[in-house]
Structure formats: structure tokens, C-alpha cells
Amino acid sequence: MDELSILNELRKYRDMDLDYEDGTILGSMCTKPHPLTRKISEMFFETNLGDPGLFKGTRELEKQAISMIGNVLGNKDAFGYIISGGTEANLTAMRAFKNVSKKSGKSLNIIIPETAHFSFDKAKDIMDLNVIRPPLTKYFTMDVKFIRDYVFDNPNKISGIVGISGCTELGSIDNIAELSKIAVDNDILLHVDAAFGGFVIPFLYDKYKLKNYRYEFDFSLEGVSSITIDPHKMGLAPISAGGILFRNNSFKKYLDVDSPYLTEKQQATLIGTRSGVGAAATWGVMKLLGTSGYKKIVNDSMEKTYYLTRKLREYGFKTAIDPVINIVSIVDEHKNETCAKLRENGFHVSVSRCVDALRIVIMPHIEFEHIDIFLDCLSNTKRY
């Protein structure tokens, strides 16, 4: 095949895909990347951070991107990597937990909530984690009293806690401040999965913060050991651009393996060959948007989230919880059936595991008119 024929054939397949701008993708935590990232992607498309000695400039951009994210998270001296996404980030954190526990002689008992992302199920399978599931409060956050009592009743047997800041299904935020105190008092590692919330919570206006939640989650809390945060979600970087940050580089020794045939003799990330596009694009978008840009993006999405919630109630629908961030859960005992019918009508939503509800994520590509059309479709779907 010649080049033009190949491109024409590829276009046929690309045209089968959905486009974010159509406003029909309502269940994804990704969105259309910032236009600047097209140029950055072309500039860095052949770089490989898996062999950083060959791409020293790209590696320096990664370090600066981590420092900028760390600054958002209360610690510009944080150590970490721009990697494939939240799954790899969470696996990396659990791998560090495992190796720290091995050195300290603790059993690999980790407290992880039911609201955690499915990547922790993968971590459990790969690393043979013993997972303790605490009960949830009515706000779908971990019961801190249960955790405190459990740790007290099982001294030196808990090696780590995972808290969620912006849970995938509902957007709820665990009380990381209290979990931090428990971690410090008992010499326990604390990982925060803020894959989605990390580029939302720091930029939220106070008027959108609910009194039932503690919004602190970052390295300003002494007990936080590591944080997952994805620039390719609300950070507007292209896929794949996930992030794993540790409080300091003392965790590196728990991740390193020998890599004698590369330009650096030790390697820490789960994926060896890593495109430099994610790191460069994260650097570029963060430099361009800055705090004011992200505040506008986040709070525009929150305004639309509140609009959707208000209109849902006018239509007679209920939400499982008031929106904590830009995620809305629509109570529906027949969630899977409704989800399938909506998909037949062109709207792609998802469902929650921990509650009977449809799950809507209001990303920057969603406009008010998209919400109105969706509401009419949902209302008609539930009428029959």
C-alpha cells in the first residue's frame, strides 16, 4: 500500500471512534487534550525516558514537571515519574509498600476501601497483598474510627493505608488528614490515589466545597508517603501521562532494579520503554495554563456539574451523594439496563459498583447544551 492509501484506510477506522467534542462521552475521566500538546507530541514523539541518558533534555523536563506537580501538592521537592497512568502509578506505590514492608519485617497488610480503583485489585493479585476493607460512611468515605481501632488492635501488623481523593465512581474524598495522623502515630505508609482529584481539588473554589468532607490530601500532611495524579485527566495532557510522586527520593531504592545495558544503571518504573511525550506535554500545559488557567477549567466544570444536578432534581431524579467534585451519580436500580439504552441513543455513560447509580463525569469537553440534550434522552429512556 502507498502512504495515501494507508492514511485513507486508517481514517476509516478512526472515524469509527467517538469524539469528545460531540458531547456524548459522559463517563470518561479523559478529555480532549490541550491543542498545544499536538505540537509537543510531534516534537518529542521519538524520545524514550526508559533510556534517559540518551534523552537528557527530556529527562530534565520530566524532573521539572514532577517538581511543578509537587508544588501543586505541597512539596516541590517530591520525587517521581510521569508514567502511563493511574494504574501504573498505584501499582508502583504498592510495590514500594511491599518492599518497605519486607525490609521492616511487617506483613503485607494494606487497608484499602471498597471505593478504590480496580488497579488495586491488580496489585492485590500481582503482589499477594492482604487487603483489609473498612466500612464506608454514608458519604462513601472510609470509616476513620474503624481504621484507628483496627490499627490499635493489630499493632505492627498494618504496613500501609490507601486513601482516595476523588474516587472514580462517586468523586468522594476520604479523610486524608485523619488517615495521616494514624499513619504517623503508627509508622504506617499512606498512599493517596488522586489520579482524578489531583488536578481538581487544589483548584476548587470554596463555594463548591461541601462541609461533610475534608479536602486536604497532599504532602502538606505529614503522613502522606505517595500520591497518584494523572495529568492526562483534568490536567489536559495527552494520553499517556500519569504521575506517581513520593515525598522524597528515599523511596527510590525500593523501586530500583539493575539495568546494566542502559545509560543509567538502575531503573525504577514498571514500564521500561517510556515515551517522553507525556512528560514534555505535562510541562508545556502546566506552564501555559498555570494556577489561574486550571482554576477556570475546574470551576467551569463544577458550574456545569451543579447545573446537571439541579436539572436532574427538576426531572425527578436523585443523586447518591451531592457532587464533591465534577462527578455525578444518578440513582438507578436498573443502572445497567439504562446505561445500555442510553448507549443505543448515542450517550456513553458508565455505572458505579458501590451503589446502584449511573456515573457521569463532567469534563471540559461537556457544554451546557450537551447536558440539556442528555437530560431529555435520559428522561425519555426512563419513561418506557
UniProtKB/Swiss-Prot annotation:
It comes from the Archaea. InterPro entries: GrpII_AminoAcid_Decarb, MfnA, PyrdxlP-dep_de-COase, PyrdxlP-dep_Trfase, PyrdxlP-dep_Trfase_major, PyrdxlP-dep_Trfase_small, Pyridoxal-P_BS. The keyword S-adenosyl-L-methionine does not apply. The modification N6-(pyridoxal phosphate)lysine is found at K233. The keyword Lyase applies. Keywords: Decarboxylase, Lyase, Pyridoxal phosphate. Its EC number is 4.1.1.11, 4.1.1.25. GO terms for molecular function: aspartate 1-decarboxylase activity; pyridoxal phosphate binding; tyrosine decarboxylase activity. One of its GO terms (biological process) is carboxylic acid metabolic process. Its cofactor is pyridoxal 5'-phosphate. Pfam families: Pyridoxal_deC. Transmembrane segments: none annotated. It catalyses: L-tyrosine + H(+) = tyramine + CO2; L-aspartate + H(+) = beta-alanine + CO2. Pathway: Cofactor biosynthesis; methanofuran biosynthesis; Cofactor biosynthesis; coenzyme A biosynthesis. Catalyzes the decarboxylation of L-tyrosine to produce tyramine for methanofuran biosynthesis. Can also catalyze the decarboxylation of L-aspartate to produce beta-alanine for coenzyme A (CoA) biosynthesis. Belongs to the group II decarboxylase family. MfnA subfamily. HAMAP family: MfnA_decarbox (MF_01610). This is Probable L-tyrosine/L-aspartate decarboxylase. It comes from Methanococcus vannielii (strain ATCC 35089 / DSM 1224 / JCM 13029 / OCM 148 / SB). The gene is mfnA.
